[in-house]
Amino acid sequence: MKFIIMITVGGRFLCRLWACLVIIILHSTFSILHSKELTDTIPLTFEYNMPVVKALINGQERRFLLDTGSSASILMLGTGDDYVLTGDSIEMEDAYGEREMTGYTQADFCLGCFEGEKNFYFMPYNEVLHGLFDGILGMDYLEYMGVVVKIDVKRGHLIVTTDKRLFNREKRKKTTYKRDKTDRLPKLKVKMSPGGKVKNVLFDTGFNEMLELRMEDFERLMHSRRGEDFRQQLTGTAYGGNQGTALQQRDSVGRTNFRLKEMKALKTKLYDIDAHAEVTSDSKLGAAILNHGAVIIHARKRKIYFLPNGE
């Protein structure tokens, strides 16, 4: 009996030892695989209330606007730029109504440690970007690379990683956005609490304000069943220094400026928000929200995580 007990105890010890060895082996294997993930921290500036990073195009440093409101990446061609232009040329109209030829170009692109050949739509270097940036990095780049990015204006950096678990321990608020069927851009919901909500709001870091409502969405809120609640949110609008009701304050292009007492976006409440309504194709949540916290974007999973400042 004692012999059997000793064997049983010894067997349990060996089983535990074997289990520990298996765990160590699996952990080591995972660590090796995990170490193959790429991560880089890239300096980011917040210019004109928009996120800007530097990248290399064919070895030449260029400044790119990180724009979630653009489905394509765009390169502005300057004098002396030497790129291999490919594809059919497209005639388009610039900001001054002049017609220009454009198309797309292939270039060696390097953002931190992430490099490879990438297609860019090219445009003549004109006033489309007001001469402020050399190009745009759109949602196509995030989806094509399969990376997760963290835009952190407070710390002044952009973290780009293929490690999907890198930010798991950070306290964050998750929003699953809807991908537009036409341009695949991120659309989400914004609440005016109280006072209703607006669906299909474009999350657009290439828009340097906080909130822009389509005039149709604005009018619908004003005349909805909760229209009175929404109107109470409007703490008085000012256009050209005048006070009055929101519907009265319009300029020649149909813009209405107003201020919201409270708004909920990316699962976060924000207060005293300057906003406006305008005749435009989409309601937009803009890059000004990056002043209130960092944003993590996982484009392939259609997730946006918001990390409010101070939490």
Language-model regions, residue ranges each:
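N-terminal secretory signal peptides that target proteins for export/translocation
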Residues: 1-15
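Pepsin/retropepsin-fold aspartyl endopeptidases
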Residues: 35-311
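Bacterial N-terminal signal peptides
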Residues: 18-29
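Generic recognition of cysteine residues
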Residues: 15, 20, 110-113
